[in-house]
Amino acid sequence: MKNTILILFTAFIALLGFFGMSAEALADPKADPLAGPNPDADPEAINLKAITALAKKLLG
């Protein structure tokens, strides 16, 4: 059961990362893709560190 939850959580985080980066790419299409994320490009970009911290807090 714990493995299933871990797999689903990992897939959820991967999807959030994919859609977050897609939104950032749409917001700043001229950005260098190898330069890394630009926090100024999309103010509503998903904060993965906050999501990870919340998940650790909830799952223990």
From Swiss-Prot:
Placement of AXPX repeats on the sequence: 27-30, 31-34, 35-38, 41-44
Compartment(s) where it occurs, according to its Swiss-Prot or TrEMBL record: Secreted
Biological process annotations from GO: defense response to bacterium; defense response to fungus; innate immune response; killing of cells of another organism
GO CC terms: extracellular region
Secreted found in the keyword field: yes
Expression tissues: Expressed by the venom gland.
This protein's UniProt keywords: Amidation, Antibiotic, Antimicrobial, Fungicide, Immunity, Innate immunity, Repeat, Secreted, Signal
Keyword Transport: no
Family affiliation: Belongs to the MCD family. Mastoparan subfamily.
Name this protein carries in UniProt: Mastoparan-VT3
